[in-house]
Design a protein with these regions (language model features):
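Non-catalytic accessory/assembly modules
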Residues: 120-131, 138-139, 144-160, 164, ...
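A conserved hydrophobic secondary-structure block that centers on an alpha-helix together
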Residues: 179-195
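Buried hydrophobic packing residues in well-ordered domains
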Residues: 19, 37, 55, 96, ...
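M16/MPP (pitrilysin/insulinase) zinc-metallopeptidase core fold and M16-derived inactive scaffolds
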Residues: 29, 34-99, 144, 164-169, ...
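C-terminal regions of mature proteins
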Residues: 201-204, 357-506, 623-695, 699-707, ...
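Active-site-adjacent "gating/activation" loops or surface patches in catalytic cores
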Residues: 28, 253-254, 489-519, 532, ...
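A glycine-rich, aromatic-flanked flexible loop/lid motif
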Residues: 306-313, 505-510, 559-561, 713-725, ...
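M16/insulysin-pitrilysin zinc metalloprotease superfamily fold
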Residues: 63-67, 99-132, 313-370, 529, ...
Length: 917
């Protein structure tokens, strides 16, 4: 099996006698085992008279089997042992994947095997789970991506299974009794959930021989009982579905145009990747490229090329454009320019050096990846086994060892107006149809022949050039020797207004690193005006630099400017060879970039649009956003920011920039593959930069103190009919003990809260809890979004649950030690990749954990907590002894709550009168 020379893991691909293909991965560094099983079946195999049945099957597999009869037994087992679990039903594949503490690997496999062998498909639970699926469907009805997807389904070949409604809801299941649905579930399960139609990946720290014995012990008994039904797929698009324009009316304020080209399947070309080559060229943002041309003319602000629907017999190639107000007026010219660029590519040909450059980039990303979490890798590999031969399972996504210039050029023949679908998405289009299920207004019409010809007769070709060679490709250099005194960051420079830290990685041994610089600016204390102008200034700066350093990003050297409560930050990460120079260049860019007139209106419009669209977010997301605003002194609501944003001018940006830079405190961390002398040198450069400006203290991030208030409530405005509620409890203090108790309490309550309020009471699809600290002060949140019940009912349900937990607390005593172990394992979990390690160390510095021992201290604190202490903590929470409580809700179509609370009508008034921790 082909693997990177830098990959220290061991792999073994086996196939059992029953046809089950298994990839075993031995990773000595992983603390959690991860497993994923994927079946070659999805909603394409739904019954024609029962859309969504495969989705229902996915849900039902978790609700009991012959060996573990209790609903959600697998989920509860995983959650209790520090893991997570999920499932996905796609078009042609369905996947089930989880992670768990390594010592429970065998028991988790036993659960998985039982789930896949003999599910119960209990009729009473089928009825309940249909309610959950219907709630899931209703939850997404205002999601523009889902609404757009449904229009796609209605404008393709109606005989192709892609056109079917894949989610399911009450309406699709209603014609059938629970018994009839059970028979349908059994039929699909027996026909498709068979070992010879499945691939499994297990990632573990155990030896490959031990893992192999584990899976063979269980899965050898799984019998293949049915021959897989052969169901040839028709074409995705009929002739009438191509050469068309589809106008779609969105809910959000967006102006997009998507050009879709219908291509054959691409998996046979995985070693030459012709579409990757075309995407690389079409998506280039440098001068001379398509996006640069569109920006100059103020037609578009963003372009992505290459994504799109993909299956075993088809591939869509999408060119996705974010248009400006001006661009909407000139859509035909935008398309004509695109075809001019295609003509340039066809005439110029694809030089071999371009493919070699992409191959070199792929090799770098393969040799030195930011390692994904094992659960994500297991899921990926369980799918890859269907896509690649065994020798290329690991390399398949990166492999470009058989370049085919001619094949790549031939793909351009599919980029013709007659083979194109134009989707125009904006609030001003005229529509004639409404898509089923999501009520998306749309229209579809053939493109007139004179327009088709016009698209090919543009005279823009001379304005374009193909991308230049990438000058940022990192050169190979030996990794720096690790100095033991720097394996944890140390402060190497400290003076008025400046603190610099430096450390070396001794674990991942990659030629990479991360630089963090955070600016705490005195000016943010002036309030929302400076906060909004700062946000726009950072966006304007990013716009300029993204184009200038586009190739650096492609070559694995990234930067991120972003605003935060105290000011703004600059982060660079990726390959270390030229990164420190890159970082100092970006600091210089902060000073020299003062003129933003060329793209001011575009960027401001995009920022305003994004803030305005926040009103359309799901109710539960809106509520959590408002809670964050309510609790944090320096945080402001999107609607308030939007009101300020629309009136900002270039002069305002210039003035705010001067204010922000006039007084600030700068703190930084350089961590990764650099020697101490490199760190001292860049620190001297940063010091020189720092001396040009005034200093100030770090900005205090205040948290509203609601512990001594009555229960407070706030009604959140939302353009969605579902009621939703979040109840937030603020802990008595931010001591290690209270943080530990809060984390443990949330972990203890999470599974029963979900099981009782979602699975049993069917209150909604979005039901859950979470540990929610604000600037290190601990808290717990409980949330429900329901399509069926008013907010007041949901509030009572949460309070009743908490009261009953206290009454029945002893039934959870037997889980206590296991739960504590799970939390401690999470706290001591090893970093998956270098960036994660750098981020953790940087957060520790920000949280004043200067010895980097917080996790160890917290683990010891948790170890010392006994069950009586968590009982007393929960009693105090329910009776609000020392706790604050906030109820935020969106009433949907129902009345406001009549709960006895201290009602907040104006957040700014509340914040101005609040005490802050």
């Amino acid at each position: 099996m082909l693997k990177s020379a830098y990959d220290s893991r061991q792999y073994n691909h086996i196939e059992l006698a029953n046809g089950l293909r298994i990839l075993l991965v031995q990773d000595p560094n992983c603390v959690k085992s991860a497993c994923s099983v994927t079946f070659n079946t999805g909603h394409f195999n739904d019954d024609k008279d029962c859309h969504g049945i495969s989705h229902l099957l996915e849900h039902m597999l978790f609700l009991g089997n012959n060996e573990f009869t209790e609903p959600n037994a697998f989920n509860d087992f995983i959650a209790t042992h520090g893991g997570s679990i999920n499932a996905l039903t796609g078009t042609e594949y369905s996947s089930y994947f989880y992670e768990i503490a390594a010592e429970y690997e065998q028991q988790a496999l036993t659960h998985l095997y039982a789930m896949l062998r003999k599910p119960l498909f209990c009729e009473a639970l089928i009825e309940k789970e249909i309610n959950a699926i219907d709630a899931e469907f209703l939850l997404k009805q205002k999601d523009d991506l889902r609404r757009l997807y449904q229009v796609h389904k209605e404008t393709c070949n109606p005989e192709h299974p892609f056109s079917q409604f894949s989610v399911g809801n009450h309406q699709t299941f209603e014609p059938f009794s629970p018994f009839q649905l059970k028979q349908k579930l059994i039929r699909i399960f027996e026909h498709f959930y068979q070992p010879h139609n499945a691939c499994l990946c297990l990632i573990s720290n155990q030896k490959l021989s031990v893992s192999e014995e584990s899976v063979r012990l269980l899965f050898n008994h799984w019998q293949s009982n049915y021959k897989l039904p052969i169901k040839p797929l028709p074409v995705l698009y009929l002739e009438r579905n191509l050469g068309v324009q589809i106008n779609i009316l969105p809910l959000r304020k967006t102006q997009r145009m998507i050009l879709t080209f219908a291509l054959p399947e691409q998996q046979t070309h995985y070693r030459s990747k012709p579409l990757n080559v075309l995407s690389h060229i079409l998506g280039d943002e440098s001068e001379g490229g398509l996006l640069h041309f569109y920006k100059i003319r103020n037609w578009a602000t963003n372009l992505s090329a290459g994504g799109g629907l993909e299956g075993s017999t088809f591939k869509d190639f999408n060119v996705n454009l974010q248009l400006t107000n001006e661009g909407i007026k000139y859509t035909d010219e935008v398309i004509t320019a695109f075809f001019s660029y295609i003509q340039l590519m066809m005439e110029s040909g694809i030089e071999m050096w371009r493919i070699e450059e992409i191959a070199a980039l792929n090799q770098l990303m393969w040799d030195f990846p930011d390692q994904a979490k094992p659960i994500d890798e297991a899921y990926h590999y369980s799918l890859a086994m269907f896509e690649y031969p065994s020798q290329h399972l690991i390399a398949g996504d990166y492999l470009l060892d058989k370049p085919e210039v001619q094949t790549t050029l031939q793909m351009l023949n599919y980029f013709s107006p007659k083979n194109m679908r134009i989707k125009v998405v904006n609030p001003f289009v005229k529509t004639t149809h409404k898509a089923k299920w999501y009520d998306t207004p749309y229209s579809v019409a053939p493109i007139e022949s004179n327009r088709l010809k016009y698209f090919l007769n543009g005279n823009w070709r001379s304005r374009f050039t193909l991308p230049q060679a990438n000058k940022f490709l990192p050169s190979h250099r030996p990794q720096k020797a690790v100095e033991p005194q720097f394996t944890l960051p140390k402060k190497i420079l400290s003076e008025d207004g400046l603190d610099m830290w430096y450390g070396q990685d001794d674990k991942f041994h990659q030629p990479k690193g991360d630089c963090f610089l955070t600016f705490d600016c005195q000016a943010v204390n002036e309030g929302i005006y400076v906060t909004t102008a700062k946000r726009l200034w950072v966006a304007l700066l990013n716009e300029k630099l993204n184009q200038k350093y586009y190739q650096a990003n492609l070559a694995g050297m990234h930067f991120h400017f972003y605003p935060h409560q105290g000011g703004f930050s600059l982060q660079t990460n990726g390959f270390s060879a030229n990164q420190l120079n890159f970082c100092t260049n970006l600091l210089t860019e902060i000073i020299v970039n003062k003129d933003f007139s060329s793209n001011f209106s575009q960027v401001k419009s995009r920022q305003y649009q994004g803030l305005s669209n926040a009103l359309l977010n799901k109710p539960i997301n809106r509520i959590f956003s408002k809670l964050s605003v309510l609790m944090q002194q320096q945080n402001h609501a999107p609607s308030e920011l939007a009101n300020v944003m629309q009136n900002l001018t270039l002069d305002d940006i210039a003035a705010t920039r001067e204010k922000l830079l006039s007084q600030f405190h700068l703190e930084g961390l350089i961590f990764g593959d650099w020697a101490a002398e490199d760190a001292y040198k860049i620190s001297a450069d940063i010091k020189e930069f720092r001396m040009m400006f005034g200093t100030c203290d770090k900005i205090h991030r205040g948290v509203a103190d609601i512990r001594h208030n009555k229960i407070i409530s706030y009604q959140v405005e939302c353009l969605h009919k579902d009621p939703a509620v979040v109840i937030y409890f603020q802990a008595p203090d931010a001591s290690l003990k209270n943080i530990a108790l809060t984390i443990l309490a949330e972990q203890l309550l999470a599974a029963p809260f979900f099981n009782q309020l979602r699975t049993e009471q069917q209150l909604g699809y979005l039901v859950g809890s979470g540990y929610i600290p604000y600037n290190q002060h601990p808290g717990i949140g409980f949330y429900i979004q329901s399509p069926h019940h008013p907010a007041e009912y949901l509030i009572k349900a949460i309070h009743l649950f908490l009261q009953q937990i206290i009454e029945n607390i002893n039934q959870y005593r037997h889980l206590w030690d296991t739960l504590k172990k799970g939390v401690m394992k999470q706290l001591m979990e090893k970093d998956t990749n270098l960036s994660m390690k750098s981020q953790r160390l940087w957060m520790a510095i920000g949280n004043q954990d200067k010895t980097f021992t917080y996790s160890m201290q917290m683990t010891q604190t948790i170890l010392d907590i006994d069950f009586s202490e968590i009982t007393n903590y929960l009693i105090a929470l329910v009776s609000r002894q020392g706790f604050g409580e906030a109820i935020l809700y969106s009433p949907g179509q129902h009345a406001s709550i009549s709960y006895k609370t201290e009602v907040i009508t104006d957040i700014q008034s509340f914040k101005s009168s609040s005490q802050y921790l």
